[in-house]
Amino acid sequence: MKCSLRVWFLSMAFLLVFIMSLLFTYSHHSMATLPYLDSGTLGGTHRVKLVPGYTGQQRLVKEGLSGKSCTCSRCMGDAGTSEWFDSHFDSNISPVWTRDNMNLTPDVQRWWMMLQPQFKSHNTNEVLEKLFQIVPGENPYRFRDPQQCRRCAVVGNSGNLRGSGYGQEVDSHNFIMRMNQAPTVGFEKDVGSRTTHHFMYPESAKNLPANVSFVLVPFKALDLMWIASALSTGQIRFTYAPVKSFLRVDKEKVQIYNPAFFKYIHDRWTEHHGRYPSTGMLVLFFALHVCDEVNVYGFGADSRGNWHHYWENNRYAGEFRKTGVHDADFEAHIIDILAKASKIEVYRGN
């Protein structure tokens, strides 16, 4: 009797081990074949599949995108198309200065404060705290939807836009980024009529329509104090030059260019050629970090080799290139490499 009972227990034990082995094999096979899951609980209606990632992680990839980061024909977020680009590009650094990245590292702080040194020093964080009570301190580009194609036009101010006929094409983009003076009235056929982002300094600032984001490019703490003043009390009227005491822009659409991002371009992309990157480069790399597809208009000389603005008739207006502040030739070289890497499309104009 005792022997029979012992045999029965051993048989049951072997059976249990066999069943557990089958379950483990089935489970392992199921994961290896990457089953599809309903992503309704993830806020969408698309089916997704589990993709092996790092230990303890599972990444969700939407079916049908073949791993692409957007639905454009070319996507900025797709790695592997250019080793040079991938080694320079850092998606973790935000082009917008916000409450979350308010604290600058000492090396960035020193570099930024030397761009336009001031006699009186200011506590940058205290200035930002006050500013973010007036304008948003959030990053509007935090989330990227791989099911969208955000097309962006970066419109420079080159005279090569005159007679180009690019206007309608420029206006077809989701984001249209312009800089400094950049008039559109009277030039719509060549430069377009729409603007979504306008990048300016205090010394170049102008009033904007309510549907346009004013992106302030600050060179000093006084620039931050100026925008807070220009949207409230109007006390600041002078930086190193006269500035508008009041500015008519949509407060909810004001964004502040991140000095850390500014230095990142200087260090990694323009590689310290010139004292600091030009406004055109600042806007171009802003677009490269918030857009899926980037098309560039109005950069470089015209077909006769003249460097002037499209609203000017003075072909000698490009004398700024000789100041040494920016290295226009090296920046043009970087733009050419980006185009060859299929990261941007450059429209050369007239």
From Swiss-Prot:
GO terms for cellular component: extracellular region; Golgi cisterna membrane; Golgi membrane; membrane. Keywords: Disulfide bond, Glycoprotein, Glycosyltransferase, Golgi apparatus, Lipid metabolism, Membrane, Secreted, Signal-anchor, Transferase, Transmembrane, Transmembrane helix. GO terms for biological process: ganglioside biosynthetic process via lactosylceramide; globoside biosynthetic process via lactosylceramide; glycolipid biosynthetic process; glycoprotein biosynthetic process; lipid glycosylation; oligosaccharide biosynthetic process; protein glycosylation; sialylation. The soluble form derives from the membrane form by proteolytic processing. Glycans are attached at residue 211. CDD domains: GT29_ST3GAL2 (cd23979). Substrate binds at residues 116, 157, 180, 240, 276, 280, 300, 309, 326. GO terms for molecular function: beta-D-galactosyl-(1->3)-N-acetyl-beta-D-galactosaminide alpha-2,3- sialyltransferase; beta-galactoside (CMP) alpha-2,3-sialyltransferase activity; protein homodimerization activity; sialyltransferase activity. Its main location: Golgi. It is an enzyme of class 2 (transferase). InterPro entries: Beta-gal_alpha2-3_sialyltrans (IPR051757), Glyco_trans_29 (IPR001675), GT29-like_sf (IPR038578), Sialyl_trans (IPR012163). Pathway: Protein modification; protein glycosylation; Glycolipid biosynthesis. It catalyses: a beta-D-galactosyl-(1->3)-N-acetyl-alpha-D-galactosaminyl derivative + CMP-N-acetyl-beta-neuraminate = an N-acetyl-alpha-neuraminyl-(2->3)-beta-D-galactosyl-(1->3)-N-acetyl-alpha-D-galactosaminyl derivative + CMP + H(+); a ganglioside GM1 (d18:1(4E)) + CMP-N-acetyl-beta-neuraminate = a ganglioside GD1a (d18:1(4E)) + CMP + H(+); ganglioside GM1 (d18:1(4E)/18:0) + CMP-N-acetyl-beta-neuraminate = ganglioside GD1a (18:1(4E)/18:0) + CMP + H(+); a ganglioside GA1 + CMP-N-acetyl-beta-neuraminate = a ganglioside GM1b + CMP + H(+). It is a single-pass type II membrane protein. A beta-galactoside alpha2-3 sialyltransferase primarily involved in terminal sialylation of ganglio and globo series glycolipids. Catalyzes the transfer of sialic acid (N-acetyl-neuraminic acid; Neu5Ac) from the nucleotide sugar donor CMP-Neu5Ac onto acceptor Galbeta-(1->3)-GalNAc-terminated glycoconjugates through an alpha2-3 linkage. Sialylates GM1/GM1a, GA1/asialo-GM1 gangliosides to form GD1a and GM1b, respectively. Homodimer; disulfide-linked. Homodimer formation occurs in the endoplasmic reticulum. Belongs to the glycosyltransferase 29 family. This is CMP-N-acetylneuraminate-beta-galactosamide-alpha-2,3-sialyltransferase 2. The gene is St3gal2.
